[in-house]
Amino acid sequence: MQIALAPMEGLVDEILRDVLTRIGGIDWCVTEFIRVSERLLPAATYHKLAPELFNGSRTRAGTPMRVQFLGSDPQCLADNAAFACTLGAPVIDLNFGCPAKTVNKSRGGAVLLKEPELLHAIVREVRRTVPAEIPVTAKMRLGFEGKEGALDCARALAEGGASQIVVHARTKVEGYKPPAHWEWVARVQEVVGVPVFANGEVWTLDDWRRCREISGVDDIMLGRGLVSRPGLARQIAAVRAGEEPEDMSWAELQPLLLDFWQQARRKLAPRYAPGRLKQWLAMLTRTYPEAVALFAEVRREQDCERIDQLLALSP
């Protein structure tokens, strides 16, 4: 069984990957998508979105990181994937699940689920171009509007050469609205001969248990559930090891929240750093009452030094 941290554009950047993987329980993580259209991207683009490439493609905690691409041109994607491998990418992941309208309008992400033949062509060309020892994996949703093409899309990915498929158990149109249709993950697993990961609507340990029972797969990718409950992967890992699954207390999370903020201040412009903190805090309010109180204090603050003080004073 493996537990993966989902690639969420605009949320799970290098800073949050660093913090969440240090908490434990995560077997591997994925970069935000690298968007490819018509040209070979420079090394600086990869290093900006995936600075872990300088650290053997691992986070500070030693968690392996995969490089994810998004686009619709098979040859361009393949060329960029091959270049990423020369920079140290250990696994190439392909995004066929992003539901964002701006991405879909430019023929990226979930809109490609309308074209299983193109999915196959993309994976086949990337698989043909990158070194044989580099795995090529893919992430998909159940479809764009309906689910009737889900199995065809999954087959296209597997037959094209994907060695692993993550299934976000909703369509593009469903977005992030509950429920996630975990029973469809089971159907996908039945028609492909590669490992399948379940993804979507796993917020708690009980959600994970239900997902595993309904989907029939052991492997899980956690996204918003892990961001809002940072100890969730550690809890799941404890259960699978036969240990007591202790939740993460606010007191244990506080130093990591402060470290997240300090990294944001160092790496981002002062006008952007507060927004990143507020984004994570807002998600933490789902789990921690203390986060509700702290978020209420910082939500209108743009002064970084004042936020320093509020974080230092928070109980």
UniProtKB/Swiss-Prot annotation:
Keyword ATP-binding: no
Cofactors required: FMN
Any one GO molecular-function label of the UniProt entry: flavin adenine dinucleotide binding
Domain of life: Bacteria
CDD domains xrefs: DUS_like_FMN (cd02801)
Amino acids binding FMN: P7, M8, E9, Q68, K139, N199, G200, E201, G223, R224
Record-annotated site: Interacts with tRNA: R35, N95, Y176, R276, K278, R299
Active-site residues from the entry: C98 (proton donor)
Reactions this protein catalyses: 5,6-dihydrouridine(16) in tRNA + NADP(+) = uridine(16) in tRNA + NADPH + H(+); 5,6-dihydrouridine(16) in tRNA + NAD(+) = uridine(16) in tRNA + NADH + H(+)
Transmembrane stretches, start-end: none
Keyword Isomerase annotated: no
InterPro entries reported for this sequence: Aldolase_TIM, DUS-like_FMN-bd, DUS_fam, DusC, DusC_C, tRNA_hU_synthase_CS
Gene3D superfamilies: Aldolase class I, Dihydrouridine synthase, C-terminal recognition domain
The enzyme's E.C. designation: 1.3.1.-
Keywords: Flavoprotein, FMN, NADP, Oxidoreductase, RNA-binding, tRNA processing, tRNA-binding
Function: Catalyzes the synthesis of 5,6-dihydrouridine (D), a modified base found in the D-loop of most tRNAs, via the reduction of the C5-C6 double bond in target uridines. Specifically modifies U16 in tRNAs.
Family affiliation: Belongs to the Dus family. DusC subfamily.
Name of the protein described by the UniProt record: tRNA-dihydrouridine(16) synthase
The species this protein was found in: Aquipseudomonas alcaligenes (Pseudomonas alcaligenes)
